[in-house]
Every structure is written in C-alpha cells, then in structure tokens.
C-alpha cells in the first residue's frame, strides 16, 4: 500500500549518495508496526505486531571480525534478536543473528548489498547445494536437505507512503530466496520461496518491507503462504561522528527490521515446521 510507480531511472544508473539511504550510527532507532497473514489460501489468519529496531554498538566475532549490532524487539512477530553486519567499500556483509536458524548458520557470511547501488543491478548472494535444512518437513524423523539460492536486485526509485510520512525518492530493493527441499521419505522435491521487497529513504533507512513466503503443498496439505509487512511509524537518526565522514564506503544497513531476515532470506513454514527466523 502507498507505493507508486517506479521513477524513470535508467538501468545501470548509479543512485547518488547510496550510503545515505542506510544510516547506522549507534543510537539510531526505528519503530515499526507490522501485520502477518498466513495459512493455506482458504484459511488466512491475520496478526498485528510492533517492532523497534536500534543500533546498539559493535561486537568482535571469532577471527577478529568487527561487526555492527542491530537489536530488534520483535521483527516479524518472532521475539527479540540481534543481527550482525560489516561494511566496506564493496558493500555490506551479513554475519548472522542471535538466535539464528541452522540453515542461516550454513549460509553466513554473505553480501546483502553492493556499493554503489545501481538500478537493475542484481547479484547472487549465495548458492548452496545439498545442505542440512534444519527441519523435518515430512515427519520421518530425519532433517531434509536443501538447495538454496539468494539473489538481490535494486529495482529503482519511487514514492512510498507510510505512517511516518511520504518519501518521494525511496530506493526499492527486491531480495529473492529459492529453496528446493529434498524430502528424505520420498524421491521428490518441495519448492519454497521467500521474496522481500523493501523501500529505503535517504537519511532515514528502511521505511517499509513486504515479504511473501510460500511452501508448495506436501502430501495432502494445501501448502502454506505467509505475508509479512512492516511500516515505519517513528524514526530517530543519530548523526555520524564528524571524523567518520560519509562516503560510498561508509556504514550501510540493508534492513533495519532483521530479518529478517537476514531475516532477509529466511522462510517461514507451516506451524511446527517453521525455523526461527529472526
């Protein structure tokens, strides 16, 4: 709701001051309201939630890698989590979250955005074959294995309206994850997809995302679809230290919510089959 037509931005055109769309100074805070609709097509259930995301500091991971820490109180209505990111001149790398999923732990670290942003630019974030899915979908007591690919695309710039206001030149990014789940009890594959469309405003960060997660029907069930939306209500952006400067290589954050998912690339499945994604 509230997003207009993509502006006339040519493919390959660089979006000026890309870093300014992803403020991540410690103390910056975003408040979102969210909605989830889930279930087979015939039985959709709606839930509402709130999430506050804030930049809390840095952490040194094993191996000496220093990452930024983003704390979310309830992203995607899944309880509190911390997410870890590192930025350099090439872009932003995601190092996972706490708590994270077994699947995510096998994928990180991976790049979530490239600098500078360019319209219609896509890149493959990960492509892993035959890894542990971390869940037993078919109920035979054995975790399934999965082939998983993630691709990110900068769609362009357009106007977006949310409770916090209207942002006329927001950057729209689409992240698509595709899973081919190999069922251990039968010689067949279940297909899952997670598509997140997110809008970022200059000087503000994430203002909205829409995420659709789908799992094809298994056996006699009707499959499962989950739609998650978060919209910005309030934001407080702290200024960067004067000595830090601002450039294409300055700190950027792809999603202030977490995935979500990475958070950005997690799939929610039917009740009882759902990895903890946030």
Please tell me what each predicted stretch does.
Residues 1-10:
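Signal peptide processing junction and immediate N-terminal pro/mature segment
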């Amino acid at each position: 709701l509230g997003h207009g037509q993509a502006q006339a931005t040519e493919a390959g055109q660089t979006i000026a001051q890309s870093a300014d769309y992803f403020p991540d100074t410690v103390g910056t805070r975003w408040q979102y309201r969210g909605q989830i609709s889930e279930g087979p097509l015939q039985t959709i259930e709606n839930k509402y939630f709130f999430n506050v995301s804030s930049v809390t500091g840095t952490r040194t991971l094993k191996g000496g890698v220093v990452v930024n820490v983003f704390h979310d109180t309830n992203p995607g209505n899944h309880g509190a989590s911390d997410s870890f990111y590192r930025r350099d001149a090439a872009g932003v790398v995601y190092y996972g979250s706490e708590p994270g999923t077994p699947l995510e732990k096998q994928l990180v670290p991976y790049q979530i955005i490239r600098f500078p942003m360019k319209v219609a630019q896509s890149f493959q974030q990960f492509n892993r074959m035959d890894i542990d899915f971390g869940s037993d979908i078919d109920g035979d007591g054995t975790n399934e294995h999965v082939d998983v690919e993630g691709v990110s695309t900068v769609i362009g710039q357009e106007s977006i309206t949310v409770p916090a206001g209207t942002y006329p030149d927001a950057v729209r990014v689409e992240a698509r994850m595709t899973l081919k789940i190999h069922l251990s009890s039968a010689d067949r594959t279940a297909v899952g997809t997670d598509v997140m469309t997110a809008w970022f405003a200059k000087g503000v960060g994430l203002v909205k995302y829409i995420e659709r997660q789908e799992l094809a029907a298994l056996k006699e069930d009707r499959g499962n679809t989950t739609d998650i939306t978060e919209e910005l209500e309030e934001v407080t952006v702290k200024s960067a230290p004067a000595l830090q400067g601002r450039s294409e290589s300055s700190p950027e954050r792809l999603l202030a919510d977490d995935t979500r998912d990475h958070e950005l690339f997690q799939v929610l499945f039917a009740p009882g089959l759902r990895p903890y994604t946030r």
